[in-house]
């Protein structure tokens, strides 16, 4: 009788949060946190972590060793790929040298090739409305630096660039209806999916919603080129005509520049037959962000067999506009440019860092948490997504430090290749849990709601052993709730789990999807995969894929709160009698 009573008591505790354990998690995370120390080393010491680069490999090894030093088991690097070529910036300078000296706020795009040495060259501005107008520049570009696109007016800022969700916005997220299966929410930019049922109120400010850009050829602001894909056509012409480099203006302002990867020149086409432009920010050679993706459309710049391209540089919008206006007045500009980069072809594979807290009676079952460790290169990857990595590491550190004994194994995974197309998590999911034959892990995915991904599904050995995956990848903002990804069965469970943290501002339960980050890789094959709702702060306006993605833009108290809540969700998931319920399979 005593054994039965104890078993019943343990079962009850496994279904509802244990207040004493929640209090211990909170105390450890708020009063003994290491999250900012972890993030500072990752972003300040290791720095930017482009997929395939030596810096990312160093981050893989440092996180593996750090997790081991905290007492986690089976810490390792798991390879995926082949990815392609690594790249790093060794030396760069850029300034207008005539008719006057103007030091430029600028950054080369990733995977840009080197120049043969420092050069000073005349500047040619190409500001046209359609591809047919490019013909007049033939014979004028050899040995020149090309400015791609004209002046873009900038608006003053009359609203705060840093915001938190208001009570009204959280309520709207809570009351929204579920989306049709397979339809992605707005991208992971700042909470662009909305939801149903809310709890704790927010703090003042206006939260923006945003869609994350894709991986390639970015720099110009959306809408800079209308009609045919003039940016690609300009690059093609510059390449064919023997130009030295191509520069464009950033979509940012106030000296903030948003920089991603260089573009591969498109195949030469008749200007009158030019294809329509892809959505701004879409990756060169990768599928657009939508529900069911077609295969990639040709080589990406990081592919070992990618066609040659020109050095490509993004300049701050204010300075780019000034140069365009000077040329409009008839000034003859020269730019002095020096660019030395390095490619790494020896190891085409990329790596995820993985470590575990072993479970007890249900040790064969898994609860996962993670964030992507790769970043773009102009900042140090602090908010995208060093913050999510540091929070995931801190969450498992908290549980390990408290010597809690989870029933299920808790596994932390720190991904690579997210910025290029969720490649690290998608390959991991395919290797361990399953995949759709018609949607291989090399194809990029964007929106949420992945259960509509094409079948049939081939299940891996651990498909039925994983309870859930939790992700954080919307910058530095604290957790305000969680996206349920259309899984109505988890709403009440998550609502109970958030109650102990209502005073910390977390309480919104949203049925809607959000996409464009690594939880989608799990959700796409029917595994419960969740992204937390985060306050926007400056993510869309200032730090996301920019040179301002640095440690100083991070809010330490927000990350402490996020790590506490993430640790609590991991513990509660690990202690339940049953795994978290899954959404019905398509066709059920």
Short names for language-model regions:
Residues 1-11:
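Bacterial N-terminal signal peptides
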Residues 37, 45, 397-423, 439, ...:
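Short helix-loop-beta-strand segments that form the rim/entrance of peptidase-like active sites
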Residues 17-53, 374-375, 471-477, 540-546:
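N-terminal capping segment at the start of a domain
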């Amino acid at each position: 009788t005593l054994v039965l009573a104890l078993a019943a008591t343990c079962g009850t505790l496994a279904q509802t949060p244990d207040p004493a354990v929640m209090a211990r998690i909170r105390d450890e995370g708020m009063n003994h946190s290491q999250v900012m120390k972890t993030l500072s080393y990752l972003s300040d010491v290791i720095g930017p972590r482009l997929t395939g680069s030596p810096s990312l490999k160093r981050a893989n090894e440092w996180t593996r060793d750090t997790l081991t030093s905290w007492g986690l088991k089976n810490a390792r690097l798991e390879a995926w790929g082949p990815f392609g070529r690594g790249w790093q910036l060794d030396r760069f300078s850029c300034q207008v040298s005539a008719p006057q000296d103007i030091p430029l706020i600028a950054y080369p795009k990733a995977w840009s090739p080197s120049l043969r040495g420092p050069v000073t060259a005349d500047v040619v501005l190409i500001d046209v409305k359609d591809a047919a107008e490019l013909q007049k520049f033939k014979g004028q570009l050899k040995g020149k630096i090309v400015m791609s696109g004209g002046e873009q007016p900038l608006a003053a800022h009359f609203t705060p660039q840093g915001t938190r969700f208001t009570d009204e916005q959280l309520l709207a997220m809570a009351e929204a209806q579920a989306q049709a299966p397979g339809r992605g929410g707005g991208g992971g930019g700042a909470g662009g999916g909305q939801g149903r049922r809310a709890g704790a109120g927010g703090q003042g400010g206006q939260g923006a919603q945003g869609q994350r850009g894709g991986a390639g050829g970015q720099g110009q602001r959306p809408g800079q080129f209308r009609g045919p894909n003039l940016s690609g056509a300009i690059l093609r012409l510059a390449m064919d005509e023997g130009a030295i480099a191509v520069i464009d203006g950033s979509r940012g302002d106030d000296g903030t520049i948003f920089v991603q990867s260089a573009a591969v020149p498109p195949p030469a086409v008749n200007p009158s037959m030019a294809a329509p432009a892809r959505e701004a920010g879409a990756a060169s050679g990768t599928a657009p962000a939508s529900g069911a993706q077609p295969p990639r459309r040709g080589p990406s710049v990081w592919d070992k067999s990618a066609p040659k391209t020109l050095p490509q540089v993004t300049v701050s919008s204010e300075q780019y506009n000034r140069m365009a206006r000077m040329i409009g007045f008839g000034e003859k500009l020269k730019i002095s440019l020096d660019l030395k980069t390095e490619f790494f072809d020896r190891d085409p594979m990329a790596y995820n860092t993985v470590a575990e807290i072993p479970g007890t009676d249900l040790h064969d079952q898994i609860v996962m948490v993670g964030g992507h460790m790769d970043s773009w290169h102009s900042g140090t990857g602090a908010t995208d997504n060093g913050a999510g990595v540091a929070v995931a590491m801190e969450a498992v550190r908290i549980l390990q430090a408290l010597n809690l004994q989870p029933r299920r194994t808790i596994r932390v995974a720190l991904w690579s290749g997210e910025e290029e197309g969720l490649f690290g998590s998608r390959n991991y999911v395919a290797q361990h849990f399953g995949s759709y034959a018609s949607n291989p892990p090399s194809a990029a995915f964007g929106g949420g709601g992945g259960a509509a991904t094409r079948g049939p599904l081939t299940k891996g050995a651990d498909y039925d052993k994983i309870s859930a995956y939790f992700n954080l990848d919307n910058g530095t903002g604290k957790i305000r709730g969680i996206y349920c990804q259309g899984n109505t069965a988890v709403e009440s469970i998550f609502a109970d789990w958030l109650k102990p943290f209502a005073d910390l501002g977390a309480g919104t339960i949203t049925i809607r999807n959000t996409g464009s980050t690594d939880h989608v890789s799990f959700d796409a094959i029917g595994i419960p995969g969740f992204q937390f709702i985060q306050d926007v702060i400056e993510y869309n306006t200032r730090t996301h894929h920019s040179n301002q993605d640095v440690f100083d833009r991070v809010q330490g108290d927000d990350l402490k709160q996020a790590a506490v809540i993430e640790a609590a969700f991991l513990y509660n998931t690990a202690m339940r009698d049953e795994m978290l319920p899954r959404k019905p399979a398509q066709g059920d």
